[in-house]
Amino acid sequence: MTATATRRRRFSVGKGFAWAYLIGVLVVTIFPFYWILRTALSDNYALSADPASPLPVGFTWGPFKRVLGLATTQESIAEGGSGASIEIGHFLVNSIVYATVSTVLVVFFSTLAAYAFSRLHWRGRNLMFSLFLTALMVPGILTLLPNFVLVKELGLLNTFAGMILPFGLFSAFNIFFLRQFMLGLSTEIEEAALIDGAGRLRVLFGITLPMTSGPIFTLSILGFIGMWNDYFWPLLVTSDESVQPLTLALAVFKQSSPQAQPDWAGLMAATLVAAVPMLALFMAFGRRIVNSIGFSGIK
Amino acid sequence: MAVLETTARDQRASGEATRRRKNARRTTNPYSPAHRGDAKLAWVLIAPALVGFAVFAAYPTLRGIYLSFTDFAVLSPPEWIGLDNYRQLLGDEVFWSSLGVTVYFVLLSVSLGLVVSVVTAAVLHRITSSTVIRGLIILPFLISGVVAGTVWWWMLDSQLGIVNIVIKAFGGDGIQFLTSRDWAIPSVALINVWKQMGYTAIIIFAGLQTIPATIYEAGRVDGASELRMFRTLTLPLLRPILALVVVLNVINAFQVFDIVSVTTKGGPANASNVLQMYIYSKAFGQFDFGYAATMSLALFVILIAITFLQMRLLRASESDTN
């Protein structure tokens, strides 16, 4: 056997292992999503009798009806539910408002600040920038409790303003990230426009902002995912269903399930309903999300 | 997010930028009309961020420090009690056991997560550039900790959970994953690894792609095995990105809450009562905000110390290789 043949064989054995490993990782990653679906389409009693079946047991739409409040309380309890439901449309709107408004605001304000830090010449610029950066060192836990007290004092508990303001105005990471990107951009076009008499704001919105759209998208998508999945902060500042996001609704729904014999099918239906918007976002922007995450590490 | 690592990198970068700008200023006319009015506009542009920084970052940080010296139950004004909270902290067995539990969780979840994500990234890099596969791997990152916790709570159930059914089918004894003292933290750590692994792997994968292929040519000519090249060439080149990922994951893991709160709720008997869980229960269960602030501050100090230690270690090993 020649040396090249040996190498090629070793090569393909290694590749075989690599594929086997990757398939293993993919199965572990994806299986829980399938299991949510399979359980959500099952009947609770059939489920306890045959918990190992890979397919839905006693196929029924009942769990979704229970969760969405389309079944009567009696029906729900007869099927092993607690009678509690999730007004999905309502919580969905709350989550959309919370995640969208805070993301859009914080990315927009960060872009403005990044422009001031990267393009304008002003006294105190470096001092302000270093001051902003110190915020990167402070973990959430240190500011969350005092922020709760502050929001309470401002009378903003159970309001979108109270939920959004602490995250919608300032993000040290966003400002830093965008400033770095802007410093790396060539300023020739901007300077030409300035010489032609365009105002600073026109240059910012007409030239700099479009050229920064890549990182702006990255920060928006990562910010949106983070806010959509946020649980701790809304848990602190909301107790009223009128503003609570989906994550809280799911946690409340889970708690209302009887502990001795939980309504597994209903819980999984609720979980699926809570996960669907993110899965839809993923279908729409999958490639860009993947690239955004990779990009966020390298920058 | 990219906290300290980026801060350090930025200081270098901003140093460069200032130097560049100083040079630029020397050559252009300092009285150039191009920068007239810059200052006024700059303050307008940073105004929203400045308000956010002052009101929701700086003020709460200082106030948190102040509250840690007070007895404060939210409804009545805080009362200064000096070091009482700190004395209480030193003697609070639940706090120290929480800290122990949290450190155990961080070690398990960060080390396991790092190994799995490095291997996954390397495998991906080696055999496929499919965006679909990379996309599938980050799916768990897109869902909330509440959703992830609820699903695994079901899959790890001791009676009907599929994981135990499979274990029993292979002749094993069922495991009380979330309800036994020994398994509570490892289980929560596994769920956390499941949720975060793909995200970390994609960042490392992106790092791998920036390594030029020519670096490996010399090794290949010498007949070095792929594993050896991975160890001697790839890993050292990846070190900055691995450091970033470890710092991020450690900081996040120290503040774990969502997954614990929907799976074990800190139980059984405090076996998985991680720090953030304990702080939350002190503040919102017993309305002891002063003491909760003291514990938050302690957690902050621990995080700072660990991060500096990690940066030190990183810098030390960097100077070794140079």
Where are these regions (language model features)?
Chain B
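Generic secretory/membrane-interface signal
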Residues: 4, 10, 29-32, 122, ...
